Amino acid sequence: PEAEKHLPQRQGYIVTGNPVRPEILAADRAAARARLGVRPGQLCLLSFGGSLGAQTINEAVAALMAWHVPEGKLHHIHATGRYGVELLPRLLREKGVAYENNPNLDIREYIHDMPDCLAAADLVIARAGAITLAELTAVGRASVLIPSPNVAENHQYHNAMVLANHKAAVVIEEKDLTGEKLVAAVKEMTADPEKLREIGLAAKALGVPNACGHITDELLDLYKTHRK
């Protein structure tokens, strides 16, 4: 609904939400966590910055891993993107992080099993594209959003602030992103599981899991109207 004020002012807009893949909605959390090696009761982080990767996000995630890996309390799935495949391991080596063969770290170039990863996650660190937010809200996941500044009219920032204004996410702008700020945000959110759950519930309240059905219904109504 917030997008309407940016559109030409005329009647006839219908808010449907963005379609979410059925696999995202149907993924089984317990099965996903078992398959991904998340221990019972262990908090799971999921982080990604797009298929190419983002240097600033990979740098901040390296600092995040340096913070949580020694304690071993968190399971962390991270997609480096194409340009982070060599960067992140180098940063982790420089920080002395034992990342190789670490059962609590799942570092890969790209996430091909997003339904399982989202189902397993308790907290997601991501950009703020429309489809990403549609998926996060549909499944009710708490998130730290880092909007890409390299988009038309800074729309990812506006997307992210919709969630932030409903206490459904924490937003860190890329110009303000540092390892210390990301660690502080994740540390605060994971320190209180009840607060993390509340953020997830606030996100879910914004979700439209049946957006595809809404779009189909509107198209059928339009077809029937013009067929007469």
Describe every region a protein language model picked out:
Residues 1-9, 132-133, 153-160:
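Short, glycine/polar-rich helix-capping loops at beta-to-alpha or helix-loop-helix junctions
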Residues 1-30:
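Active-site-proximal region of nucleotide-activated glycan assembly enzymes
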